[in-house]
């Protein structure tokens, strides 16, 4: 009852995003009862901060202080006000520094969903104010324009397949496996070795498989930094492309692709796949 039953780390989808007038959380009154219960549940043990990789590296993020600052405002009776959270209560730098790794949530004895709180405030910064950490805007532009975060030539995505005798999926043909390679395995030479090894395994298995020529970035990065609009556009494009083909299982090459395809795509119409 006190915790979400959805997968840990799942970012809530904004329904009918083009019709919304506000995005994320920018004022205290926008927090719901569960968010406020989380603030009150903090026992101030500091385990979240102790395991935060950004904090341990000397960065500006202190998960404990974020929750305590929000709790303090709540106890002072600010729940009905229109007080702006950033920078009055929480600094922009701390929100933008979060990697959304979830270590704080795993360690919290009260199971406070710290990352979700940060994500909601960061979504407001991204979609309402256009504020991102340094370098993020360029990465988002790359995903939108060429389908990968590094701005590399989309025509070179499958160059590493040369000589491997791997088929591109065709409509009307059934495949046991559709191999979702992902951007890292497609462009990074070290990760290409892993993808090639997986192809050898698939060939030895005797299963029919193919890759999808239209594959592009799953845009998980966009969602994590708060750019939900780009994420939804990219996701719907990927789902539409996947639905052209007949396959039993979708095999993801990396944990980021796996989590996105398995846990987040099902939020969208026709986004349910056996991953």
Regions found by a protein language model. Give the residues of each.
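Short, charged/polar, low-complexity loop and linker segments
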Residues: 25-26, 47, 92
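Short cysteine-rich clusters marking metal-coordination/redox-active sites
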Residues: 42, 52, 98
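Iron-sulfur-cluster electron-transfer modules
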Residues: 30-39, 61, 65-67, 74-270
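Membrane-embedded alpha-helical bundles of multi-pass integral membrane proteins
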Residues: 1-25, 30
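Active-site proximal loops enriched in glycine and acidic residues that flank catalytic Cys/His/Asp
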Residues: 46, 54-56, 70, 112, ...
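Short, flexible loop segments at boundaries between secondary-structure elements
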Residues: 271-275
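The canonical Cys-X-X-Cys-His
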Residues: 45-48, 52, 104, 108
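Juxtamembrane segments of multi-pass membrane proteins
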Residues: 27, 50-70
């Amino acid at each position: 009852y006190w915790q979400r039953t959805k997968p840990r780390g799942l970012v809530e989808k904004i329904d009918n995003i083009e019709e919304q007038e506000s995005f994320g959380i920018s004022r205290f009154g926008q927090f719901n009862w569960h968010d406020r219960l989380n603030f009150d549940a903090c026992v101030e043990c500091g385990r979240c901060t102790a395991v935060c990789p950004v904090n341990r590296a000397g960065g500006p993020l202190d998960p404990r202080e974020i929750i305590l600052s929000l709790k303090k405002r709540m106890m002072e009776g600010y729940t009905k006000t229109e007080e702006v959270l950033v920078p009055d209560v929480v600094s922009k730098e701390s929100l933008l520094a979060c990697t959304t790794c979830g270590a704080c949530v795993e360690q919290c004895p009260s199971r406070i969903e710290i990352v979700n709180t940060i994500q909601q405030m960061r979504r407001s910064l991204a979609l309402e104010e256009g504020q991102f950490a340094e370098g993020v805007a360029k990465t988002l532009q790359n995903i939108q324009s060429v389908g990968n975060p590094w701005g590399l030539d989309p025509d070179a995505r499958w160059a590493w397949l040369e000589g491997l005798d791997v088929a591109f999926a065709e409509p009307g043909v059934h495949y046991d496996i559709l191999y979702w390679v992902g951007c890292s395995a497609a462009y990074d030479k070290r990760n290409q070795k892993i993808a090639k090894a997986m192809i050898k395994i698939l060939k030895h298995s005797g299963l029919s498989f193919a890759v999808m020529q239209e594959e592009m970035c799953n845009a998980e990065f966009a969602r994590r930094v708060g750019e939900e609009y780009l994420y939804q556009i990219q996701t719907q494009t990927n789902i539409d492309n996947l639905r052209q083909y007949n396959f039993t299982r979708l095999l993801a090459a990396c944990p980021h692709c796996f989590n996105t395809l398995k846990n987040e795509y099902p939020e969208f119409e026709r986004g349910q796949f056996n991953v």
